[in-house]
A protein has these predicted regions:
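Signature of dsDNA virion morphogenesis modules
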Residues: 1-193
Length: 193
């Protein structure tokens, strides 16, 4: 449908209405893979929260690769830093193909299709094959949140209830009883297909 895309397939600009294109400043002839999203508890038990990439993106402007399999070898580079613009955008979950209420902040790369270096990646992009993207990252600010009555975990319990309602799949966090709140992280050199 219009306005929806899979984060692993990237964004097909030709299928979006003009208002969506304008809100992202998107251009035809570019590939827009979603590398990461916020407000979701993953299998690692961490939850990224909006604006966690702000400092890193400013510090690394023009220095982030798009690669295959987190490999920075010359034969794995999909796009070099000079051709990768990295930004965040708050979007509805449906926009990234998920059936949750509310929104997420997506970490998105903008890459000219004619600058894609790796033939295997070109095929994945052209065929719109569903393949996972991810970011090589380093935590900067991470906090332990726990739904516990233990006297030594008072602050952790407060964190749990301060953040739980922002998590799209909060039932998973409630069942587990804890999660890691990530409020700042660094992109370490690359995002990967």
């Amino acid at each position: 449908e219009k306005g929806q895309f899979s984060p692993s397939k990237g964004l097909d600009v030709t299928k979006l209405d003009e208002s969506v294109k304008a809100s992202f400043n998107m251009k035809e002839g570019y590939f827009y893979p979603v590398i990461n999203t916020t407000n979701y508890m993953d299998s690692h038990g961490d939850v990224h929260f909006p604006n966690l990439w702000n400092k890193s993106l400013k510090d690394n402007e023009g220095g982030i690769y798009y690669v295959a399999d987190h490999n920075l070898g010359i034969k794995s580079v999909i796009a070099f830093p000079k051709d990768v613009r990295v930004f965040t955008k708050t979007v509805d979950w449906a926009f990234v193909g998920k059936n949750y209420e509310g929104s997420t902040q997506a970490l998105i790369y903008e890459i000219p299709i004619d600058k894609i270096q790796l033939n295997e990646a070109k095929n994945v992009i052209n065929e719109r094959i569903d393949i996972q993207n991810s970011v090589r990252m380093q935590y900067v600010k991470v906090f332990f949140a726990a739904n516990s009555e233990h006297k030594d975990l008072t602050e952790n319990r407060k964190l749990f209830f301060d953040y739980i309602d922002q998590i799209a799949n909060k039932e998973v966090a409630m069942e587990q009883g804890y999660f890691y709140v990530v409020t700042e992280a660094k992109v370490v050199k690359e995002g990967s297909m």
